[in-house]
Amino acid sequence: MELKDYIATIENYPKEGVVFRDISPLMADGNAYNYAATEIVQYARDKEIDMVVGPEARGFIIGCPVAFALGVGFAPVRKPGKLPREVIEATYEKEYGTDTLTMHSDSIKPGQRVLIVDDLLATGGTIAATIELVEKMGGIVVGCAFLIELDELKGREKIGDYDYKVLMHY
C-alpha cells in the first residue's frame, strides 16, 4: 500500500512557508490506518516491548492502536498542565524559544522496554525530550517509530544511536 496516497499536503499552514503533512485522510481510511499501525507493530514485535509512549496529540493516534496490538500499555506525553498527578518534565529548544513536555512520574517503571511512537519526525526536539523523560524514569528506549520523516530537517540526528522506523519520507 502506498501510504503517501493518504497524506494531504497543505501549503503555507500553519504559517507562510510551511508545508503541512496532514495524516487525517490516513486515519479516515480504515485499511490505510490499519496498514500503518500494523507496519509499526511488525517493527516492534521482536523488541519485547513493555510500554508504548506517544507525545500528544498525534502520537496518541498512532501509539494507542500499536500498544493494543502488542498487548501492552500506553503512556501519554503531554504539554504542561494537562496531566493531573505528579509529573516529570523535559524542556527542549525550538526555532523560536523552548517548549516543555511532561509525563506522569510513575508512567514508566525502571527497566521497562519502551517504544516511542509519533506521527512525524521533523527537527527532533519532541523525540529527544520524550527519550529524556523515559530515561529519567529508568525506562529503556528500544525503538522509535514515525509515520513521516521530514528528511531536510535532520531530526534523525537527535535520535542518535536509537533504533527507529519511518514509514514515509518527505
From Swiss-Prot:
Q: Where in the cell is it found?
A: Cytoplasm
One Gene Ontology cellular component annotation held by this UniProt entry? cytoplasm
According to the lineage, what is the superkingdom?
A: Bacteria
- According to its UniProt record, this protein's enzyme class is transferase
Enumerate the catalysed reactions: AMP + diphosphate = 5-phospho-alpha-D-ribose 1-diphosphate + adenine
- Copy the pathway line from the protein's UniProt record: Purine metabolism; AMP biosynthesis via salvage pathway; AMP from adenine: step 1/1
The record's SUPFAM superfamilies line, in alphabetical order, gives:
PRTase-like (SSF53271)
E.C. number: 2.4.2.7
Q: Name one GO biological process term.
A: AMP salvage
Q: Keywords in alphabetical order, please.
A: Cytoplasm, Glycosyltransferase, Purine salvage, Transferase
- The reply on keyword Cytoplasm is yes
Q: Which GO terms describe its molecular function?
A: adenine binding; adenine phosphoribosyltransferase activity; AMP binding
One Pfam family cited in the UniProt record for this chain: Pribosyltran
Q: Mind telling me which InterPro entries this protein's record contains?
A: Ade_phspho_trans, PRibTrfase_dom, PRTase-like, UPRTase/APRTase
| Self-association state and partner proteins as the record states | Homodimer.
Instruction: Summarize the protein's role.
Output: Catalyzes a salvage reaction resulting in the formation of AMP, that is energically less costly than de novo synthesis.
What family is this?
A: Belongs to the purine/pyrimidine phosphoribosyltransferase family.
Name this polypeptide is given: Adenine phosphoribosyltransferase
The organism encoding this protein is Lactococcus lactis subsp. lactis (strain IL1403)
Traced from the root, the source organism's taxonomic lineage reads: Bacteria, Bacillati, Bacillota, Bacilli, Lactobacillales
